[in-house]
């Protein structure tokens, strides 16, 4: 089944991401996962038994939980300390998590060890 990414929240301390996903049948879920990629809004994916096809490339994805989408739960996740990416951060903003960020691929494409200015 094909899923579309609606939104993604990232926890820099744990490296776990939370994505709101939707199917063609308008089913909506919140997926908690860890991966070598961050699912960005508008991207699509197809789940298979051992891997995930994301934008026509296979990736490993460790899924911790999938729950039915609930707006109140999503808002609670948004209130947690999170990556500046969620707040629409720009390169001129500062990233307080850079020194200990556990995210494998920065959604702002900042190389490891390079301070965010």
UniProtKB/Swiss-Prot annotation:
Ranges annotated as spanning the membrane: none
Example of a GO biological process term: cellular response to starvation
Keyword presence, Cytoplasm: yes
Primary location: cytoplasm
InterPro entries the record matches: Anti-adapter_IraM (IPR014448), PmrD_sf (IPR038679)
Stretches assigned to coiled coil: none
Keywords, comma-separated and alphabetical: Cytoplasm, Stress response
Compartments, record wording: Cytoplasm
Keyword Nucleotide-binding recorded: no
Highest taxon of the lineage: Bacteria
One cellular-component annotation, GO: cytoplasm
HAMAP family found in the cross-reference section: Anti_adapt_IraM
Function: Involved in the stabilization of the sigma stress factor RpoS.
Family membership noted in the UniProt record: Belongs to the IraM/RssC family.
Name this protein carries in UniProt: Anti-adapter protein IraM
Originating species: Klebsiella pneumoniae (strain 342)
């Amino acid at each position: 089944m094909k899923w579309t990414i609606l939104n993604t929240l990232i926890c820099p301390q744990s490296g776990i991401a939370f994505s709101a996903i939707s199917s063609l049948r308008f089913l909506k879920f919140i997926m908690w996962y860890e991966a070598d990629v961050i699912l960005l809004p508008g991207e699509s994916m197809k789940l298979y038994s051992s891997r995930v096809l994301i934008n026509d490339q296979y990736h490993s994805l460790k899924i911790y939980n999938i729950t039915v989408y609930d707006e109140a739960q999503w808002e609670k996740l948004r209130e947690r300390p999170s990556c500046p990416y969620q707040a629409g951060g720009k390169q001129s903003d500062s990233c307080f998590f850079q020194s200990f960020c556990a995210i494998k691929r920065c959604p702002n494409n900042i190389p490891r060890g390079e301070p965010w200015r």
